[in-house]
Structure formats: C-alpha cells, structure tokens
C-alpha cells in the first residue's frame, strides 16, 4: 500500500523547520529510528538520540520524532509529554492513527491502512516486522526527498560520516 504523499511532505516540513531533531523508539522501532537519525545527520541536521548520555535538553522549536508501532509504548510516552511541555513539536510514526502519543502529536504518520492494526500477518515475518520495514522505507523516502531538495551528493554526505570506526 502506498503511503499518503501528504505524510511525506508533512514530515519533511517538520524536519526543515526544526531547530534540532531528537529521535526515539523502543526495541526494533528504536533501531529504525537510529537508521533515520544517522541519515538526517548525513544531511547536515543537528540530531540526537533520546537516552544517549550526550543528548542535550529539548526546547521549543525542536522536533521529537517517535517510532512506535502501537503509539502507546509506556517508556516513550513521558518523552512526548516532556517535549510538548517545553514547546517542542512531536511527530509520531505508528501503525495506529489513534493512540496516547497520537493524541499529543503535531503530526501522526500512520503506516498502512486506517485499520487499528493495519498490517496483515506475513508468514515468516513475526510480530512487528512488516511495520518496521514499512517505516524504514517511509523514512528513507523522507531522506530521498531531502537529498534531492538540498542537492546533496554522496561526497557531501560521506564527509559527515563517522571516521572513527
């Protein structure tokens, strides 16, 4: 199923207007958020992963992006509340359009259909695999849009890649 183009445009706009970008997710969704954080950094944005020891305070004008299949992950909800309380914007990438996090978010990027849990079970792809893969592709589409809009090439992005590996 194709993801609504308005979601792509909406998240690109949120990223573009953000002072700094903070990302979080739990479990495998957290890994997907790390993939996106790395690419945003390659595109020149100031990016932090929530929970890292060197992560600064979120403030008004910043953006928190949360990847949560359910939109109700108990360990992530306080981050959403804190971000909102200081005037930061919040974008949620989730399977559910209605959830505790979605109620607080400025932008909800629902993957799949409008059903509560929209992904069919695929044999050999347990639990949230289809959501995680769909989210990864969606977020890579965001990066593609940014790369094209900013005229970035591999050399510019590679110059920002870690060299202490």
Task: State the predicted function of each range.
Residues 1-17:
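A short, well-structured juxtamembrane/interface segment
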Residues 1-3, 19, 146, 150:
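Structural signal for hydrophobic packing residues in well-ordered secondary-structure cores
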Residues 5-9, 74, 155:
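Generic alpha-helical secondary structure signal
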Residues 10-13, 31, 159:
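Amphipathic alpha-helical interaction segments
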Residues 20-137, 143-144:
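Glycine-rich phosphate-binding loops that contact phosphosugars or nucleotide phosphates
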Residues 141, 147-165:
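A short, charged, Gly/Pro-tolerant segment at domain boundaries
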């Amino acid at each position: 199923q194709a993801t609504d183009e308005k979601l792509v445009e909406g998240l690109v706009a949120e990223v573009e207007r953000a002072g700094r970008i903070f990302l979080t997710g739990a479990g495998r969704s957290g890994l997907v958020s790390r993939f996106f954080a790395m690419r945003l950094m390659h595109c020149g944005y100031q990016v932090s992963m929530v929970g890292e020891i060197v992560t600064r305070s979120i403030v008004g004008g910043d953006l928190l992006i949360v990847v949560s299949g359910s939109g109700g992950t108990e360990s992530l909800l306080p981050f959403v509340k804190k971000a909102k309380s200081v005037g930061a914007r919040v974008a949620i990438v989730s399977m559910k359009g209605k959830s505790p996090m979605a109620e607080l978010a400025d932008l909800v990027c629902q993957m799949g259909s409008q059903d509560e849990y929209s992904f069919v079970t695929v044999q050999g792809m347990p639990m949230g695999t289809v959501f995680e893969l769909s989210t990864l592709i969606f977020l890579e589409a965001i990066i593609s849009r940014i790369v094209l809009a900013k005229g970035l090439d591999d050399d510019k992005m590679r110059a920002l890649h870690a060299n202490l590996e």
